[in-house]
């Protein structure tokens, strides 16, 4: 079969479409970020907008026919506003609604009920005013605190970029020993004892890359690459080479000749004579032919 295809063995299992991690800067992203991305985008979240059925078969109420159960999640729309709040896994649903029996169905958007509330983080030691839903408040109460809610739930269940950013900050604070409570050692130890167990599934690199969007991860990678490969301007490079050649020839730099007025008056003549002699020796050497062209004291070739 492989000889029948022009590409050989490569197309036996079909053509794989390149993804965001297969080309460009996305291919250079570390495995720590890819693990977070799989948890955020490729993991099936908990059912929020429908009740999943546990049985494999069910009987139709009208036709009484037996049919298999298909727990297909609803397609959700993550709006920019959803990433600026904490919606508890909820999102906007687009569908159709038949409002009257004798009229056609019309498009409709179902939006969760939003409200602004204040949440408190023990690890960060701060209060935050965020837009939440009733489900978010219920889950915070079930988890016995906002920090537990962030650390217990996976990225696919938190869903919003704000919640993931706060979770990364909480993990980094726990990793650094809760610096926000440095003035209260007893309370600091209590918080560390209560939340330290959430650090076990993560490595320091995974915590550093956790909660970033794809664009933020690319910008962070570009910043690391620029810092690792700093380009030295040619001006500084050539200046360093010139100073090194002058130093080998015995000529001191102009900045180092600056002395007090009393000493400068005595040694000015000596420095001029020594510099002229050194430049003359430097001109005679074959490696300094280019320097003789810019030396105003050098002899002109006839």
Curated annotation (Swiss-Prot):
What name does this protein carry? Large ribosomal subunit protein bL28m
* Species this protein is from: Drosophila melanogaster
The protein's UniProt keywords, in alphabetical order, are: Mitochondrion, Ribonucleoprotein, Ribosomal protein, Transit peptide
Q: What is its main location?
A: mitochondrion
Give the record's GO biological process terms: mitochondrial translation
Could you tell me which InterPro entries the record lists for this protein?
Answer: Ribosomal_bL28 (IPR026569), Ribosomal_bL28/bL31-like_sf (IPR034704)
Provide one Gene Ontology cellular component.
mitochondrial large ribosomal subunit
Question: Member of which family?
Answer: Belongs to the bacterial ribosomal protein bL28 family.
Q: Where are the transmembrane segments?
A: none
Q: Where in the cell is it found?
A: Mitochondrion
Q: How does it assemble?
A: Component of the mitochondrial ribosome large subunit (39S) which comprises a 16S rRNA and about 50 distinct proteins.
Recorded GO molecular functions are: structural constituent of ribosome
């Amino acid at each position: 079969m492989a000889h029948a295809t022009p590409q050989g063995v490569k197309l036996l299992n079909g053509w794989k479409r390149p993804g965001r991690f297969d080309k460009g800067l996305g291919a250079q992203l570390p495995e720590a970020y890819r693990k977070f991305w799989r948890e955020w985008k490729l993991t099936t979240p908990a059912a929020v907008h429908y009740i999943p059925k546990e049985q494999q078969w069910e009987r139709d109420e009208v036709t009484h026919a037996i049919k298999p159960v298909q727990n297909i999640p609803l397609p959700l729309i993550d709006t920019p506003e959803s990433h600026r709040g904490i919606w508890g896994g909820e999102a906007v649903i687009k569908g159709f609604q038949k409002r009257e029996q004798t009229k056609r169905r019309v498009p409709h958007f179902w939006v969760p009920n939003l409200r602004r509330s204040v949440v408190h983080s023990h690890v960060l030691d701060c209060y935050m005013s965020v837009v939440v839903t009733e489900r978010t408040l219920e889950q915070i109460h079930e988890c016995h605190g906002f920090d537990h809610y962030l650390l217990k739930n996976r990225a696919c269940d938190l869903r919003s970029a704000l919640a993931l950013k706060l979770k990364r900050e909480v993990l980094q604070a726990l990793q650094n020993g809760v610096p926000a409570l440095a003035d209260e050692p007893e309370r600091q130890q209590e918080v560390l004892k209560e939340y330290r167990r959430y650090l076990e599934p993560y490595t320091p690199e995974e915590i550093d890359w956790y909660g970033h969007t794809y664009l933020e991860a690319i910008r962070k990678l570009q910043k690391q690459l620029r810092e690792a490969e700093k380009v030295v301007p040619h001006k500084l490079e050539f200046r360093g080479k010139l100073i090194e050649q002058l130093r080998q020839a015995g000529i001191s730099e102009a900045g180092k000749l600056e002395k007090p007025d009393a000493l400068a008056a005595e040694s000015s003549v000596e420095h001029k004579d020594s510099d002229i002699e050194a430049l003359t020796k430097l001109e005679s050497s074959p490696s300094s032919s280019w320097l003789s062209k810019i030396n105003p004291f050098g002899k002109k070739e006839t």
